[in-house]
């Protein structure tokens, strides 16, 4: 009988949907990855890895600030996990999907990791992202935005 090994599963960081309220609707911030980055030219959310003993909330605040120059007003955990196979590392990655609410008048300042950004309502955001799991995440977040903040138990503090 052949001995087998498992594909490694890792959870190195977070996927953060940055949202703002605009004209009684929510808009999603999507970032376009710069040409020198992995997944160059693709559109998605803020992503980032945990450093040291950071909590998830601390990772979110740091990564949102680094990639966009924004500071979240509130952060909450969704029930959704973004999961995919990462060929570069030959691992399955599972990342919690976190929502970061920013002020409606927020001005984005991009880092070198991204070359463009745009605020989208959910239907257009789903057409712009390059990954099916992010399309599903947008649907899930949109549904959660209808009930939040009444479910304040999901809010996390840095």
Each predicted region: which residue ranges?
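Conserved N-terminal beta-strand and adjoining loop/helix that marks the start
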Residues: 2-29
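A generic fold-level signal
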Residues: 9-11, 23, 38, 90-93, ...
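Short, well-ordered beta-strand micro-motif
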Residues: 18-20, 32, 97-101, 121
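Conserved Nudix-box catalytic region and its N-terminal flanking loop in Nudix hydrolases
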Residues: 25-66
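Short aromatic/basic micro-patch
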Residues: 44, 92, 119
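Active-site segment of metal-dependent pyrophosphate-handling enzymes
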Residues: 65, 69-106
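NUDIX/MutT-family hydrolases
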Residues: 108-140
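Charged phosphate-binding loop/patch that engages nucleotide di/tri-phosphates or the phosphate backbone
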Residues: 130, 134-158
């Amino acid at each position: 009988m052949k001995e087998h090994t498992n594909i490694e599963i890792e959870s190195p960081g977070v996927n953060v949907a940055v949202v703002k309220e605009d004209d009684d609707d929510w808009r999603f911030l999507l970032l376009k990855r710069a040409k020198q980055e992995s997944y160059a030219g693709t559109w998605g959310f803020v992503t980032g890895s945990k450093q040291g003993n950071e909590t998830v909330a601390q990772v979110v605040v740091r990564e949102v600030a680094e990639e966009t120059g924004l500071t979240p007003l509130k952060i909450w955990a969704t029930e959704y996990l973004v999961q995919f196979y990462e060929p570069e590392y030959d691992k399955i990655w599972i990342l919690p999907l976190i929502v970061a609410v920013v002020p409606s008048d927020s001005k984005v300042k991009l880092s070198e990791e991204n070359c463009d950004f745009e605020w989208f309502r959910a239907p257009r955001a789903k057409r712009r992202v390059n990954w099916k799991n992010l399309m599903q995440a947008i649907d899930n977040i949109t549904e959660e935005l209808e009930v939040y903040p009444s479910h304040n138990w999901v809010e996390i503090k840095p």
